[in-house]
Amino acid sequence: MGVNVFGIINLEKPRKEKLEFREPFEVFKSIYSEYESSFLLESMESDTGLARYSFIGFEPEMIIRAREGVIEIDDGDSREEFDSKNPFEDLRGFLKMEKNSGGFCGGLVGYISYQAARFFDTIRLSEGDFPDFEFGLFLDGIMFNHLTGECSYISRHGNRLPDISPLLGDEVPTGTLGYRRERTLLSKRRYMDMVLEAKERIREGEIFQAVLSSATDYRLRGDRLAFYESLRRINPSPYMYHLKLGEREITGSSPEMLVRVEDRRIETFPIAGTRPRGRTEEEDGVIASDLLSDEKELAEHLMLVDLARNDIGRVSEFGSVEVPEYMTIKRFSHVQHILSHVTGKLRDGMDAVDALGAVFPAGTVSGAPKIRAMEIIESLEGVPRNAYAGALGYLSLNGNADFAITIRSMVCQGKTGRIQAGAGIVHDSIPEMEYLECQNKARALLKSMEMAGEQVDPDNR
């Protein structure tokens, strides 16, 4: 395609103006209803050590979508389309890699659908209902540094601070969300049958593991920020997000990083092995000890750490891949997980787009070997995953990137919202237990929906 938008847009030196620090969500509520497209990427404290920055963006310069071999550029006034054999190769035309450290300094913010894996590996996946990717090019926004307590307006193109300043002091009440369950894509019986089919493939030696998911669709009306407000209250995570790009919105509380690139250091935190939280700290400890002595969970985690090491090794300098943290317990509101930390250093000639492609999709939402596991998932689940199990985050103009795995999320298109969760299937999996794991992972989302409003007939206004 050969598009270079920075031949059209004048990229200025970074402008930074300090603002009074307020809670990111309170600021976002003031901005959300004023713009058709906006985002909040919010880090909230947990014992993972990942919470660092939060970002708000609004009304991007353009939105870039890829679907069916075509890239569409929508600047709000007009749309252009270009044929593209591999849209991720062409995505670099919307980035200007600058040598400048420090998180996000303007760039692409959006999501990548699970179906986009076919551009990174030789695999056949069906077309989804969502674009393969959808990013806004955001050249200004608000940055919150939770370590220093600083808040700043940052800009690389123009100055829209006067436009939003009148909004920033507003106290905006949250509305309510009306919802109605429309359909569950898989019954409990069908999900357990899928587990048995996957175990048969494992016994035949095709794979070691496959992550099978179940989804439920809801009809929605009202204030979707009410759902996010409830979710951040009961399930704070290092990766909280509310992304609105026109008619598509993704709201989530992901515990798991897909990949981060900062100053050419690449890292990921594979999570595998799950138990519910206890009612007390002592009960938490007992449950965690049981988790760390479960041979099935440990074998699954080791497999996924090895997969992460291999993925990162594809784009890292020889000998630079390390595992500085291995099989530690990390706790969230409703569940606790086994977590490890895998790092590497990007080798010369590689960038954040290469790093993203090397690890996408995460082994923790696909399986091992990854390609064959994904083919089996496609045949068993029967419907495209779309944004679920893909990635959401940013590619910064300075070459940095930070993406969460799109799990523990509600994915909305129009009036429909979908909640989806999965479990890793191995040779000794018990179908009933795997089904319950999916339910445990979705519990915080369902509770958030209940807190945000009430079950109604959304078409009865």
Swiss-Prot record:
Pathway(s) it belongs to: Amino-acid biosynthesis; L-tryptophan biosynthesis; L-tryptophan from chorismate: step 1/5
A biological process from GO: L-tryptophan biosynthetic process
Binding-site residues for L-tryptophan, renumbered to this chain: 43, 238-240
Q: What GO terms are given for molecular function?
A: anthranilate synthase activity; metal ion binding
Tell me, what controls this protein's activity? Feedback inhibited by tryptophan.
Report the superkingdom from the record: Archaea
Q: How many cofactor units bind, and how?
A: Binds 1 Mg(2+) ion per subunit.
InterPro entries registered for this protein in UniProt: ADC_synthase, Anth_synth_I-like, Anth_synth_I_N, Anthranilate_synth_I_arc_typ, Chorismate_C
Where do the annotations place Mg(2+) binding?
300, 437
Please provide the record's keywords in A-Z order: Amino-acid biosynthesis, Aromatic amino acid biosynthesis, Lyase, Magnesium, Metal-binding, Tryptophan biosynthesis
Q: Where does chorismate bind?
A: 273-274, 388, 408, 422-424
Q: Quote the catalytic activity from the record.
A: chorismate + L-glutamine = anthranilate + pyruvate + L-glutamate + H(+)
Entry's EC annotation: 4.1.3.27
Write out the similarity annotation.
Answer: Belongs to the anthranilate synthase component I family.
What this protein is called in its record is: Anthranilate synthase component 1
Organism expressing this protein natively: Methanothermobacter marburgensis (strain ATCC BAA-927 / DSM 2133 / JCM 14651 / NBRC 100331 / OCM 82 / Marburg) (Methanobacterium thermoautotrophicum)
* Record gene name: trpE
